């Protein structure tokens, strides 16, 4: 609930209780957390290693406060996952958080600025989405769930053709 409190990789099962479809990994935040610079650098290395090594990684959800825009660390993360996005090895969903604090014009502007930033790493093959999101008023929650479900579905092996 409190931003910046995640200090480990936390895994959550998605899907039915007795037969999870996938795991959701919550990685430590690196912008807001009130911890030492050394800890933040250690987290960055953990995240970079995780994003680089996990071949089963289907996608990355990057949460950005649209009032602040993409931070330098966000841009570094995008550069890091860029090659995997370009060859469609992973997908990206950027959630512009705290959308309840934006009026319509500011929300539209934030979406356009995010799209402009993401255009720098986007290719025809990449699967990149961006949406306004608010946990408070549930804006974007259903759309995000649809995207995550589609990621899980894309991991399932194709059904054998009928004989």
Which functions belong to the PLM regions below?
Residues 1-20, 49:
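Switch I (effector-binding) loop of TRAFAC-class P-loop GTPase G-domains
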Residues 101-163:
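Canonical P-loop GTPase G-domain recognition
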Residues 30-41, 100-103:
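Flexible beta-alpha connector loops of hexameric P-loop NTPases
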Residues 26, 97, 134:
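Active-site glycine-centered loops adjacent to acidic/histidine catalytic or metal-binding residues
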Residues 20-32, 56-58:
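Short, basic/glycine-rich phosphate-binding loops at helix/coil junctions
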Residues 8-11, 26, 60, 129:
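Residue-level recognition of specific faces of alpha-helices
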Residues 44-128:
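Conserved C-terminal guanine-recognition region of P-loop GTPase G domains, centered on the G4
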Residues 3, 28, 136:
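Adenine-nucleotide cofactor-binding loop residues
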């Amino acid at each position: 609930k409190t931003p910046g409190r995640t200090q480990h990789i936390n895994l959550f099962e998605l899907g039915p209780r007795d037969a999870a479809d996938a795991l959701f990994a919550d990685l430590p935040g690196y912008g807001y957390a009130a911890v030492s610079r050394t800890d933040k650098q250690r987290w960055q290395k953990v995240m970079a290693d995780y994003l680089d090594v996990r071949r089963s990684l289907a996608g990355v959800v990057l949460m950005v406060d649209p009032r602040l825009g993409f931070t330098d660390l966000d841009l570094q993360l995008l550069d890091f996952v860029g090659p995997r996005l370009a060859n469609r090895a992973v997908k990206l969903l950027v959630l512009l958080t705290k959308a309840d604090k934006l009026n319509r014009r500011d929300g539209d502007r934030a979406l356009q600025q995010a799209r402009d930033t993401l255009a720098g790493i986007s290719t025809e093959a990449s699967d990149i989405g961006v949406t306004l999101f608010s946990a408070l008023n549930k804006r974007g929650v259903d759309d995000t769930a649809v995207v995550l479900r589609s990621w899980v579905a894309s991991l399932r092996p194709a059904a054998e053709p009928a004989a």
